[in-house]
Amino acid sequence: MKFAAIDIGSNAIRLLIEESVIKSKKDFYFKKIALTRVPLRLGKDVFVNGFVGDNTISKLVKSFKAFQLLMDINDVNHCRACATSAMREASNSEFICKLLLEETGINLEIISGKEEARLIFSNFHLSSLDSNYNYIFIDVGGGSTELSL
């Protein structure tokens, strides 16, 4: 199976496509197929004006359409699209989510800072960490910082 993740941050949007490689029921991994980054600065609009401007929305829709084509070409089975700090703060975020769904069929979730930290933490294999130590995971983004202990 192939999976895609779309990350809408304050300074860029990213598409990651990975394929699950299954050796056995307990032995599998994900192989990166593609990673695309578009330097679209939603935070520049939101943190100054409180909303995402029309020009930036237009570029966001075009980027999502391009991402949709890349997912189709790569036969992606499942996609999750998440937006973080800038979209949490944008007064027109609900409008943007509806527009993206109508234009591309992609459902954009605006996730909380807590969910963002949980997703980052879930990428680490705890079994590979030394249990004699404590760890802190820090994500410094363009509009927020998340900590996981």
List the model feature ranges, each with a label.
Residues 1-10, 16-137, 148-149:
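Nucleotide/phosphate-binding catalytic cleft detector across ATP-hydrolyzing
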